[in-house]
Structures are given as C-alpha cells and as structure tokens.
Swiss-Prot record:
It comes from the Archaea. This is Mevalonate kinase. GO terms for biological process: isopentenyl diphosphate biosynthetic process, mevalonate pathway. It comes from Thermococcus kodakarensis (strain ATCC BAA-918 / JCM 12380 / KOD1). Keywords: ATP-binding, Cytoplasm, Isoprene biosynthesis, Kinase, Lipid biosynthesis, Lipid metabolism, Magnesium, Nucleotide-binding, Transferase. ATP binds at P113, V114, G115, A116, G117, L118, G119, S120, S121, A122, A123. The active site is at D164. GO terms for molecular function: ATP binding; magnesium ion binding; mevalonate kinase activity. It is found in: Cytoplasm.
Length: 337
C-alpha cells in the first residue's frame, strides 16, 4: 500500500547548562521541551517542492501603515529563513531515497517561536526529514534523522555543533562535549520558558566572550572552568537516585549559579535579568538564560508554581511558555495510505 500523506513532529530544545563554556571544550546539557513543530508531507504532480507555512510564530512582528506604504518594523526575515531549512531537508531526503524529480508539498505549523534560541530551525528540519523520509518509504532511525538534520544545518548555516538537531530528533536530555553526545536518563522538569521578544546574535556574543577571554584569560578561565564543573554536577544530579524534591532544589541552585556566571561573561541583558528575577521572586527554584543571551529566552524550574511564574514573566514584559521536558524526539503522528 503506498503512503499518501505523513504528519511528523519534532520538539524545541533548551540548553539547560553550559552555554558559552561549551565553545571552550567544556560539556553542556541540552533537553527537548514540549513545544513542537508539525510538518505534513504529501506528493504533488508538479515535480516541484511546495512549502506551505500556516503558522510560523514570529512574536513581536510589528507592521506600520502609512497612506502609500506598508512597513515591517521587525525582523520578518526570520520566518522566511525557516523555509531554507525545509527545502534543504526535502532535497537531502529525496537524494537519500534516489527520487530527485518527485513533487512534494509540505505544510508547516509550529508552536516554537522563531529566532528565540529554542531550535526552531532544527525542529522544522527534523520534522520535515521525518515526514518526507516516511512518505518516500525510507526507514530511518531517530539517530539517522538527527544526523541528516545536522547535515541540513551545515548546508544552510555553514557551521553547526549538531546539538539542536540531535536533541530534536532523539528527545530527552543530551550531554554534549567536543562533538560527542550521550543520552541521559529521563526525569520530569516542570518548566516555564520566558521569551524577551528580541534575539541576540550568537556569532557576535561568542566573539565578544572570546575577545574578553583573550584580554583577561586569568579572570575568564576560572569562570569557564566553574561552568564546566557545574555541568558535571548537574549531570550527576540528573542521573542520581536522589528523591525528586532534592533533585529539583539542587538543579535550581545550579541554574542560579550558572546564570550568575553567564552574567559575569557579559551575555545577559536588563530584560533577561528582569525575567529571571521575576521568576525567582514568584517561587521558581532556579532561573537562568538559555542559549547565547543578548535577548532570546530564559527558563525557570517551577514545580507547583508554573502559573505564578508565568504571570510574573508576563508582568515583567516577557512571553511565558509553560512546558516540560519532552521524552520523545521526532515522532510520526499519522500516516494516510
């Protein structure tokens, strides 16, 4: 029976611990969270790739109208960028399946804000690979889907650690160091992600930290070493058989310390700090930046306090997303035959 349509989904990711220090060979822990991008794929008879984007979230899109023009005040290009990943993903899978001329229509809806540092590009690439490979009769494991997702990022961006597509494809917790991935045991984490509505340039922030590090290695080296040790401590806690409450408390403390160290590197902003402190005041056990900083998102660990923390983030001017760790990575939602 040939397949007519496939719907696949893939989750967003957050860096739990170790952003920036990971650039210096230290470990990092990332996790998939329960915000998903859905991609459905079906054949068309034009031979072309057709992409329908129904709902790509670009929060903060501002449009002004004057008598004779329409002006986009915010970065509309970010939504268009996503399409580059989709196209590349389809082309790669068509090559793998050896059916280059087949017309495919994909349709995208997403719960993941674009440009927020939550891996929206990787999620759309991974979900596209999942849907299109199944449509073309390729049986790929989630690990193989992640590897193809990494290839897509390399082709589109020119550089990629592979963290985002690996986490999105496999789900759960991933420990990463110097190109090596390790899947950690699963644990529930009740989280609230807070989006500032703006994004920093990862490239510029990494370059700024590098410059400071080169100017004052004796000051920056201990900060980066502390970050590395903190990640290993977090891994110890996640893999331990301590009771849940104790795990939450220790991870919360480590989050707060990690945020302080990131602040010392100079990658926080006034808005990120406001969201972090609002979350802590509302009862979060820990809150920190996730990702490169300079904008983007923070996240808070808030067992039993998710709605209070979400309200506090809103009052502080952020966009809250109540979520949890996603045990599953890419998954096939439905297949129409």
């Amino acid at each position: 029976m040939s397949v007519k349509r496939v719907l696949a989904s893939a989750p967003a990711k957050i860096i739990l611990f170790g952003e920036h220090s990971v650039v210096y060979g230290k470990p990092a822990i990332a996790a998939a969270i329960d915000l998903r991008t859905y991609v459905s794929a079906e054949f068309n008879d034009t031979g072309a790739i057709k992409i329908e984007a129904h709902d790509i979230r670009t929060p903060g899109l501002i449009v002004s109208f004057t008598e004779d023009s329409i002006y986009f005040e915010s970065d509309y290009g970010k939504a268009a960028e996503v399409l580059g990943y989709v196209r590349q993903a389809i082309e790669l899978v068509r090559e793998e399946a050896d059916v280059n001329g087949k017309g495919i229509t994909v349709s995208i809806t997403s719960q993941i804000p674009v440009g927020a540092g939550l891996g929206s590009s990787a999620a759309v690439a991974v979900a596209t690979i999942g849907a299109v490979s199944r449509l073309l009769g390729l049986e790929l494991s989630n690990e193989e889907v992640g590897k193809l997702g990494h290839k897509v990022e390399l082709l589109v961006q020119g550089a990629s650690s592979g963290i985002d597509p690996t986490v999105s494809a496999i789900g759960g917790f991933i420990h990463y160091q110097k190109g090596k991935f390790e899947h950690l045991p699963f644990m529930e984490l009740p989280l609230v992600v807070g989006y500032t509505g703006s994004s920093g340039s990862t490239k510029e922030l990494v370059a700024m930290v590098r410059k400071n590090y080169e100017e004052m290695p004796e000051i920056f080296e201990p900060i980066l070493n502390s970050m590395g040790r903190l990640v290993e401590k977090a891994r110890e806690v996640i893999t331990s058989d301590l009771d849940r409450e104790l795990k939450f408390q220790t991870l919360g403390k480590l989050m707060n310390i990690n945020h302080g160290l990131l602040d010392a590197l100079g990658v926080s902003t006034k808005k990120l700090s406001e969201l972090v402190y609002a979350a802590r005041t509302a009862g979060a056990l820990g809150a920190k930046i996730t990702g490169a900083g300079g904008g983007g998102c923070m996240y808070a660990l808030a067992p039993g306090k998710q709605s209070e923390v979400a309200t506090a983030i809103t009052i502080a001017g952020g966009t809250p997303m109540i979520t949890k760790i996603s045990r599953e990575g890419m998954r096939i939602e439905e297949v129409e035959e």
